[in-house]
Amino acid sequence: MNPPMTPPKLLISIYWHMHQPDYRDLISGEYVLPWTYLHAIKDYSDMAFHLEINAKARASFNFVPILLDQLEDYSAQFKSKKIRDPLLALLGKASLVGITAEQCELIIESCFKSHHEKMLSPYTQYHRLYNLYQVASQVGEDLSLQYFSAQYKSDLLVWYHLAWMGESIKRNNELVKSLIKKGSHFNDSDRLALFTLIGEIISHLIPRYKALQQKGQIEISTTPHQHPILPLLLDFKSTWDAMPGAALPLNAKYNGGEARAICHIKHAQTSHQHRFDVKPVGMWPAEGAVSKSALMLMAQQGVQWTASGEGVLTNSLHKSNPVKALVSRHEYLYKPYKITDGKDEIVCFFRDDRLSDRIGFEYAKMHSADAVRDFVQELEHIHATYQKPENPVVSVILDGENAWEYYPYNGYYFLSELYQALANHPNIEMVTQSEICQAINTPEKSLYKVFCGNLPEIAAGSWVYGSFSTWIGSKDKNLGWDLLCEAKKVYDKALKTGNLSAKEQKNCEDQLAVCEGSDWFWWLGDYNSAASVNSFDRLYRRNLSNLYVLLKQPIPAELSNPINLEVLAQLSNGDIPSSAMPSGTMKRGKKS
């Protein structure tokens, strides 16, 4: 009697998405918000570290080009010693004695923006600074600034940047350990040493990920350059696939959307190859937002694989076969799908929403060992119940930067234990998407046997609820699109006149690309804090205004008015506590 066949291993692809929008004013070059460099020293550094210390672990990373542009820009600022980020410049200022009231206000307003439970409260000296601020602020906003000495501001700046340091740095860097131990009365030398360290951390990030890729331990993919929602650039009505009858912008379409989408894709491919010495074969569409036309556009540009959310898959299966009821998730989720128009094709991986969201939203509340045990048991259950001769493929896809501030120690123990558990599990194999594609295209050269399904129809949507409700469909979001549409009409007309030089045209195109990013529309929602909405509302209108300036056209009066008047009213009715202020972390939009 033959022994029972060993079931094929479960293949897990963990895919971390890294993104920050462009926080620069492209006319002045100044950074309006500091989140890119703060996430760099905390999350991008830690995420590389966990792969570096566990050589058996495998993962994929998506880096949006505009994020990498900013990281390189920060590195250049440190080299030139000309810092264009106001908060970072204050950390590196020779002395804080005699700084302006505006600079003092920036320090006080900025340096408590974090997740207080995990990033402020654990540090007694930092928490004491917050308590002093709370007492001083009771005398009134204008007067309170007079109570803060240069020493207080120095300590606050140092502690804020220490709190934002990655856990791997806190544990292994002697300077950071000594500053945390010192706790207070930081002198100018302490502050400047920390400033220098930040420059070193940022400058080493891209080389670290490149080295991991060259070792074959990770795959790095890209995103259309400024993170636009491709399906909406192509057709607003794609919204109706998942949101029938939803309100749309007054403009019927975004003029020249296809050409703009291609520009974002090609720009991403070019910059990625320049940075990592290889052309990316994978592309994460911003927010996992796909439509049939968007997918084919990527395929035409040579993209071999992409990914989206589970909701898009279920909606697409219904659209492909409306009369067939969906059965168990095991029957349709744990395999990639091929999408084709008969000429071009692309492989699409679909996110296991339940497992991905547990990492993103649930496991932070659990002890790391319990969380890892739960995750592995879920995978073991999928493996045990997958009664097919092929390897089941589980795609865990999530934000690689914003979840960790909710975890103890920035997710240090969770990530360390997760990678160890998966890398050493006898029935689980950590793989990249390209390895799975190889198993599909050249099975004779692969260790794996992967079945690739066919998906005749795509229901346009994103990884957030399977729809575009986070970026379009509400009054404020639609107004945001209409403002962009009108700016694009002016852009097209101005370029046709021939009155702009080649350099001026390039500056205008770069500024337009910033305005086309998805983040402005995400933040125009009442599910985010009023302070967050106001901050991004102002930055979006500032970017649109800058576009008109570069086009040498008058700025429309409506760009002086907040898009979300309700948020403005909320801010006018009272101060928002620092603990509620934005820390670069987005919330999910509402289900439509």
For each predicted feature, which ranges?
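Surface-exposed, active-site-proximal loop segments in enzymatic domains
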Residues: 23-33, 73-81, 184-190, 235-248
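Short, solvent-exposed turn/loop segments enriched in Gly/Ser/Thr/Pro and often Arg
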Residues: 62-67, 224-227, 282-290, 434-437
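Gly/Pro-rich turn-and-neighbor structural signature
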Residues: 191, 198-214, 224, 251-254, ...
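Non-catalytic regulatory/linker segments of enzymes
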Residues: 236-250, 256, 261-270, 275-279, ...
